[in-house]
Amino acid sequence: MGHSSKTTEFLGLTFNLSNVLMITIASIIVLLIAVLTTRVLSIRPTKAQNFMEWIVDFVRNIIGSSMDMKTGAPFLALGVTLLMYIFVSNMLGLPFSISVDHNLWWKSPTADPAITMTLAVMVMGLTHYYGVKAKGVKEYTKDYFRPIPLLVPLKIIEEFANTLTLGLRLYGNIFAGEILLGLLAGLATNFYSQNIALGIIGTLGAIVPMIVWQAFSLFVGTIQAFIFTMLTMVYISHKVSDEH
């Protein structure tokens, strides 16, 4: 592939400009979808309103599968935001990628582990925050010593494992999809430098696999957005529910 990403330093921190660009674009797209689909609400909903209501109902069902809605209602906005943001982020690099002077600018932001691990750390931080808010510091801390204190090290390891798997699962699936799409695109174009006939053959041979893989990547990106949102709600339910 041979692509790198342009970086800059600010206040001693190094920022990947491609990541900054793509997460900004993803955020703007999600904001536009939310505004355009809820701009005019009515008893007889438009197609746009129906679409947003379907997303809200879908997330409500995800929450309801892990906790009762009385407990889970405050997390509905979080779930909808996560689902939409991760889905849009997964899709951005699917149709094409853009590189300038060997610097990759247009890609799926979730194809970078820094983005997915940041999302995972933020989510796990929220689970602890909501747990403390629901139970208080003393009662929440006691949960780590139940049913027996010997399990405390395992529970701490579990927290780190949950964070790693949440972030790396999303990254691995999206990154692998973009790598294979890049290889197929290379198959379609690289042979033109040797021979036009070989280039045409390579293009024809790559068209069907690219269409199939893009369709599969669309499915995987959708599933990964669902899994990330679902696991977020499961982890929150473990922290705020009395039975846990």
Curated annotation (Swiss-Prot):
GO terms for molecular function: proton-transporting ATP synthase activity, rotational mechanism. GO terms for cellular component: plasma membrane; proton-transporting ATP synthase complex. Keywords: ATP synthesis, Cell membrane, CF(0), Hydrogen ion transport, Ion transport, Membrane, Transmembrane, Transmembrane helix, Transport. It is found in: Cell membrane. The chain crosses the membrane at residues 17-37, 74-94, 112-132, 148-168, 171-191, 196-216, 217-237. The keyword Cytoplasm does not apply. Key component of the proton channel; it plays a direct role in the translocation of protons across the membrane. PANTHER family: ATP SYNTHASE SUBUNIT A, CHLOROPLASTIC. Belongs to the ATPase A chain family. This is ATP synthase subunit a.
